[in-house]
Design a protein with these regions (language model features):
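N-terminal amphipathic/basic leader segments beginning at the initiator methionine
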Residues: 1-47
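Conserved active-site and cofactor/substrate-binding residues in soluble primary-metabolism enzymes
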Residues: 6-14, 42, 54, 58, ...
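Fold-independent oxyanion-binding glycine-rich loops
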Residues: 23, 50-53, 70-71, 102-105
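Structural motif
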Residues: 26, 44-48, 75, 96-100
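Glycine-rich phosphate/diphosphate-binding loops that line cofactor/substrate pockets in enzymes
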Residues: 34-42, 87-96
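Glycine-rich, flexible N-terminal cofactor/catalytic loop recognition
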Residues: 34-65, 72
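Glycine-rich oxoanion-binding loops at beta->alpha junctions
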Residues: 55, 62-95
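N-terminal glycine-/lysine-enriched basic segments
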Residues: 96-116
Length: 116
């Protein structure tokens, strides 16, 4: 399969900026590689997931109305750090709590658990 990538070093940032540009209701927090809704409904449980990049549009492709409130993007085939996950939790907090959707990958399990 062929993919169009400007440079491997900027791939994740390019992808996240593109998703945010195509969907004005979303924003990209570049420092932590988090794609999130601009407006968070604080009267519902917020949903966050994430994982390694390279299988786009997962996970950022699931951010939107009726789906995730934020996605944390790791580097290509690498889990996001606990600092990235923690900042996603802080930026999407609600009065009803936050549910982290974690897949069964050891790096994701460890970093999402430590961030919580």
């Amino acid at each position: 399969m062929k993919k169009i990538i400007n440079t491997p070093e900027s791939f994740v940032y390019d992808m996240c900026h593109g998703i945010a540009a195509a969907h004005p209701e979303l924003e990209f927090v570049e420092q932590y590689k988090v794609v999130k809704k601009r407006e968070i409904n604080e009267d519902k449980v917020t949903l966050i997931s994430g994982g390694g990049s390279g299988h786009e549009p997962a996970h950022a492709g699931f951010v939107g109305k009726g789906m995730l409130d934020a996605a944390v993007c790791g580097d290509v085939f690498a889990s996001p750090s606990q600092v990235q996950v923690y900042n996603a939790i802080k930026r999407t907090k609600s009065n009803k709590g936050t549910l982290l959707i974690v897949k069964n990958y050891s790096g994701d399990c460890m970093n999402f658990n430590n961030a919580a």
